[in-house]
Every structure is written in C-alpha cells, then in structure tokens.
C-alpha cells in the first residue's frame, strides 16, 4: 500500500466525516501532506483504498464499523511516519483532529482502541481469552429485542 494513496484517502475521509468543515490548520496540514507525498497524480486518483467501500456502507448505515477500521489504519500509519521530521507536525495536527472527532477528545479511548489492534492473534493466551469473551461479545451484538425474546422463551 502506497503512502501517497493513504494520505489522499485520509484527506477525503476527513472531509467526508467532518462535513467538509475542518479547522484551517487541519486543511493546511492535509494539503501539506498531499504535496509531500505527491498524492494528486492521476495514478493515485484512479484507485481508491476506502472510498468505494465507504460509499457502499453509507447505504447500509453501518458507518461506525467502517470508520473504526479506517481510523485504526490511519493511526497505525501515523505511528510509522511519526519520526519523519518533514511531516511530523502535520501528522500530529491531523491525529489530534481524529482523536477529537472520533474519540470524543479522549486519549484513553484512543489508547484502548489501539491496544485491541495490537493483540497478537497467534498468541495462545490471547486466543483463549478471546474465546472466553466471545459469547459476551456476540450477546452485545444482538439487538435488544431478540434478547428479550430469548429470555421469555426460556421461562
């Protein structure tokens, strides 16, 4: 995956999420990163990392799921690029904006979110714990009305 594609997708994603209303510094940072990665070329504009999927999911109304995956991707990308002095300030501005808008300005929520992405799925202890918690996760995903029906049918 090309970093140029990532930055362009980020720019479009942020514009879509924020309804094209961003602080001037965020837009300036996005433009600066766009220039740094030369992400406005035809080879970049022809392809989409997220936007085609984004459009399809908007129809279904399950945007929060897709947003969380996209945000996770960008936060990991920022982690890789944070040591690049030429763009570190711009990345910091955009990361702060994402934390403010997606995580309700909670660093604790962001850290918890990122810790999930770092779990090693090949680790047997992680696997055991994950399967131990799976039933609770599945129950929380069920609509509340179907939970009530199940409780009544058991009586």
Swiss-Prot record:
Tissue: Released primarily from activated T lymphocytes.
Subcellular location: Secreted
Protein name: Interferon gamma
Lineage: Eukaryota, Metazoa, Chordata, Craniata, Vertebrata
Alphabetical UniProt keywords: Antiviral defense, Cytokine, Glycoprotein, Growth regulation, Secreted, Signal
InterPro entries: 4_helix_cytokine-like_core, Interferon_gamma
Pfam families with a match to the protein in the record: IFN-gamma
Entry GO MF terms: cytokine activity; type II interferon receptor binding
Recorded GO CC terms: external side of plasma membrane; extracellular space
Gene name, Swiss-Prot/TrEMBL: Ifng
Primary subcellular site in the record, as a coarse category: secreted
GO biological process: adaptive immune response; antigen processing and presentation; apoptotic process; astrocyte activation; CD8-positive, alpha-beta T cell differentiation involved in immune response; cell surface receptor signaling pathway via JAK-STAT; cellular response to interleukin-18; cellular response to lipopolysaccharide
């Amino acid at each position: 995956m090309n970093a140029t594609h990532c930055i362009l997708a980020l720019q479009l994603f942020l514009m879509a999420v924020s309804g094209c209303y961003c602080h001037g510094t965020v837009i300036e940072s996005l433009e600066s990163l766009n220039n740094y990665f030369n992400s406005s070329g035809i080879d970049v504009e022809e392809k989409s990392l997220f936007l085609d999927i984004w459009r399809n999911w908007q129809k279904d109304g399950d945007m929060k799921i897709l947003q969380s995956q996209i945000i996770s991707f960008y936060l990991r990308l920022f982690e890789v690029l944070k040591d690049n002095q030429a763009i570190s300030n711009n990345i910091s501005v955009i990361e702060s904006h994402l934390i403010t808008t997606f995580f309700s300005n909670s660093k604790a929520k962001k850290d918890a979110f990122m810790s999930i992405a770092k779990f090693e799925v090949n680790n047997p202890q992680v696997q055991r714990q994950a399967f131990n918690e799976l039933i609770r996760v599945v129950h929380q995903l069920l609509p509340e009305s179907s939970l009530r029906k199940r409780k009544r049918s058991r009586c």
